[in-house]
Swiss-Prot record:
It comes from Aspergillus niger (strain ATCC MYA-4892 / CBS 513.88 / FGSC A1513). It is found in: Nucleus, Nucleolus. GO terms for cellular component: nucleolus; preribosome, small subunit precursor. It comes from the Eukaryota. Residues 48-98, 139-160 form a coiled coil. This is rRNA-processing protein efg1. Belongs to the EFG1 family. Residues 33-44 have a biased composition (Basic residues). The keyword Membrane does not apply.
């Protein structure tokens, strides 16, 4: 009996399957390679320092050319001044940002403590002012109110100090050492950290106003003048900057005085050296003038001795 025709099953190759899948997934893939999508460059908010320095170098290199036209030189000089100003502003901005990050947490802690002090003193002042005549007499009440008013004024200056301290200068903390002192006092006094008035815990690190940092007094003055915002932004000349300028001025004047003194000493020494040279020249001239005369005299003396001896010989 003849066998039925049964063709052998042929297994498809893997590349055929992948080709069919690619063709089904991307019908237009055979047209060419896929185009790359270029993302737009991120625009920086502030100029690059390296780019500004490169522009300044290029402009200076161009200005060093002797054959540069006058109008082009004027344009390049203006561009150079603009680039230098931008570079200076960018460096100042970076230094300011660095100082803000460095002292941010310290300022936050001081501001928090100063705010608590102001709120407590305000509550204390309200309690004393609302107290009746049975609690305390009028004289004691007025005395306490005056003391609280002074403490409240100092506390408000402290709060403004923490808020409006110049952002581009090194921050000097007000409460860092005070917390340690309060802990130590509490351990010594057996946990009794308040006096009869209940305001001892609000004391500052510095015992008196005179002991406070120089910037504290600048903040107090700016509170009266209404220029706290300008002080914070560095638009006012603070005590530290003024002191730095005075110190640099003194150093410059001292260097100028030293140079003048050295030049004067050089002048005196040169004049003395000139005088000594003149004296030596005169002595040399005298020696030279005396030399031929002495030689002539010596020759004459020798001739006289010879004549006398010769005469004596011939006479004999």
């Amino acid at each position: 009996m003849p066998r039925e025709y049964a063709p052998a099953h042929r297994k498809r190759k893997s590349h055929d399957i992948s080709d069919d899948a690619d063709a089904a997934a991307a019908p237009g893939a055979g047209a060419g390679p896929r185009k790359k999508i270029l993302l737009p460059k991120k625009e920086h908010k502030y100029p690059s320092v390296n780019e500004l320095k490169k522009r300044i170098r290029d402009v200076k290199r161009l200005l060093n050319k002797a054959d540069l036209p006058a109008d082009a030189r004027i344009v390049q000089e203006r561009a150079l001044s603009g680039y230098e100003k931008e570079l200076e502003d960018e460096l100042k901005r970076r230094d300011r940002s660095k100082m803000i990050k460095k002292y941010h947490f310290v300022r936050f802690l001081d501001r928090k403590t100063a705010t608590k002090d102001v709120n407590r003193l305000v509550r204390r002042e309200k309690e004393v002012s609302s107290a009746g005549p049975d609690a305390m007499d009028t004289k004691t009440k007025e005395k306490k109110l005056a003391s609280l008013a002074e403490k409240l004024r100092v506390a408000r200056v402290n709060l403004n100090y923490t808020i409006y301290y110049p952002l581009d200068e090194k921050y000097i903390a007000l409460y860092a050492e005070q917390k340690k002192k309060v802990k130590g006092d509490g351990a010594e006094d057996g946990g009794d950290g308040a006096d009869s008035d209940g305001d001892a815990r609000f004391g500052m690190v510095h015992a008196t106003v005179a002991d406070k940092p120089a910037m504290w007094h600048v903040v107090e003055k700016c509170m009266k003048d209404g220029t706290l915002d300008m002080l914070r932004d560095g638009k006012l000349e603070s005590g530290a900057k003024a002191g730095e300028k005075d110190r640099k001025k003194e150093e410059r004047s001292q260097r100028a005085g030293d140079k003048a003194k050295k030049s004067q000493e050089r002048g005196v020494s040169s004049s003395q050296a000139g005088k000594s040279r003149d004296r030596s020249r005169k002595v040399d001239d005298r020696k030279r003038s005396r030399g031929p005369a002495e030689d002539h005299v010596m020759r004459d003396a020798g001739n006289d001795d010879g004549d006398e001896s010769d005469g004596g010989f011939f006479e004999m």
